[in-house]
Amino acid sequence: MGAVGIAHAQTDYQADADASAGQEMAQTCAACHGQQGISPSGAFPNLAGQQMSYLAKQIMDIRDGNRMVPQMAGQVDDYSDQDAWDVAAHFARQDANLGQTSDEDAELLARGEELYRAGDMSKGIPACSACHTPTGVGIGSAVYPGLSGQHAQYTVSTLQAFASGDRSNSPNNVMGDIASKMSDNDMEAVANYVLGLN
């Protein structure tokens, strides 16, 4: 199937996504991701309000072995593509987390805002907002996730996984290229900034 055929198939699944069916299937997700998709632990991502296309892709990537998440072993192995879209539709319709950052480290937050809004051209790091939007909601049609309100701990671990090559399932591995140019402080800064981006 060519790229046009794949895009058409994804559009069909998205159009047919049944959030009610997804809600039933998502009951097993609650232990880690919370009943409404807001995780009680910073180690696991908030799914509420996330772009449907991004969530469906992640579920299918985990199922197909294109993204390794040990905690998800066996959880989505039997999901059909439609199941993935249904669960994604359920979480996408939930209210996103409204995170708050601490003002304790103003310098760290300022660096995070700088990276998010303008990037760091001296390091070859583009602005995060270029793909994730100025408000951090992401771009569903491009499968770019929303970052607003995401747990800082999870965001840092995700950036570290992209930087190390442990995760490589972003479009054209663009996140691997970007994250590999970021220092630990850069990752911490942008993660804390997006937590409070509303």
Residue map of PLM features:
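N-terminal export/targeting leaders of redox proteins
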Residues: 1-16, 60, 184, 195-198
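Electrostatic cytochrome c docking/interface patches
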Residues: 8-26, 40-41, 93-121
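The feature marks the first
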Residues: 10-11, 15-65
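Predominantly soluble domains enriched in secretory-pathway, periplasmic, or organellar proteins
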Residues: 10-13, 96, 100, 111-118, ...
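Stable alpha-helical elements in mature extracytoplasmic
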Residues: 18, 25, 51, 58, ...
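The canonical Cys-X-X-Cys-His
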Residues: 22, 29-35, 87, 125-134, ...
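Sequence context surrounding c-type heme c attachment/ligation sites in exported
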Residues: 23-27, 52, 56, 118-129, ...
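Axial heme c-ligation environment in periplasmic c-type cytochrome domains
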Residues: 40-46, 62-105, 140-146, 164-197
